[in-house]
Amino acid sequence: MSRVGRLPIAVPAGITVTVTPDNVVTVKGPKGELVKTMHKDINIAVENNEVIVTRPSDQKAHRALHGLTRALINNMVIGVNEGYQKTLELVGVGYRAQLQGKKLVMNLGYSHPVEIEPIEGITFETPAATKVIVKGIDKEKVGAAAADIRKWRLPEPYKGKGIKFENEVIRRKEGKTGKK
């Protein structure tokens, strides 16, 4: 058995999980609703406020899908209950972020400001000029939106300038030593 897959998923009060015969999982909660189609070979059952994921055989593909399916459903349950967020920091002289309506506008040293429209289900917050918070209920979309923002200025290893995740550690390099 998969160590991840064999654990049942506890469904908190106020959250409903429904599974159709063709393995479409719908999770509704206080923050919204998520729908995802799971692989047809994996069996998903909802019993006594728990979601139980089982696999038909011990084939390598089924073992992999077992843990994956359980993790995806667990992420959906957490998302509609608590939501997800990623915090990005802008490090560099003149690097700033601000909101214009729902749109995120950043000055990153280019000749033009970088404007990013939020994808559906994602919101941006800027508590400080050098901090951006990406929030949403879908873990995959939150991570993708944060990665799209980060790719505009990846952190460089000499001074650490760029856009980095809050707890990310940038591996630093020493500069040239020069002639003596």
From Swiss-Prot:
Pfam families: Ribosomal_L6. It comes from the Bacteria. GO terms for biological process: cytoplasmic translation. GO terms for molecular function: rRNA binding; structural constituent of ribosome. One of its GO terms (cellular component) is cytosolic large ribosomal subunit. Keywords: Ribonucleoprotein, Ribosomal protein, RNA-binding, rRNA-binding. InterPro entries: Ribosomal_uL6-like (IPR000702), Ribosomal_uL6-like_a/b-dom_sf (IPR036789), Ribosomal_uL6_a/b-dom (IPR020040), Ribosomal_uL6_bac-type (IPR019906), Ribosomal_uL6_CS (IPR002358). NCBIfam families: L6_bact. Part of the 50S ribosomal subunit. This protein binds to the 23S rRNA, and is important in its secondary structure. It is located near the subunit interface in the base of the L7/L12 stalk, and near the tRNA binding site of the peptidyltransferase center. Belongs to the universal ribosomal protein uL6 family. This is Large ribosomal subunit protein uL6. The gene is rplF.
